[in-house]
Amino acid sequence: TIFAFFMKIRELKIDDYNQVIELWTKSFNNKFDNKINPNHLSDPNSFTLVSVDNNTITGVASIYIIRKLTRTLGLIEDVAVNQNYRGKGIGKKLVEKLIGIAADKKCDKTVLNSSKQNSEFYKKIGFEKNEIQMIIRN
């Protein structure tokens, strides 16, 4: 059996929220509270892309443009691909498009946080290990 699909990448729409939350929940093994920031879609510094096969969201990834005092930073977050579609280049294509957005927005650098298990994936795209992240959960 040949598994073929058509990958379309587009910006997130309100109608996508339920599928995105379900994908994040399965991918990150935790519950999301169904409360996507209502200002996200209208924020000119927030971009979320989805890959779609027919009406199924197969992947999602976001970038936030942060204008700091001396430079502009692109922060990639929440990259997830439906487990049935992994290994088909979806995650790579989503991240590459986000890097393109960062370049268009004149970001000085683009960063992301990765689990150890996904770090090789990001290295293949061109990311390199740089700093240790420290965190306090509020």
Per-range role (PLM):
Residues 7-20:
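A short beta-loop-alpha structural element at the N-terminal edge
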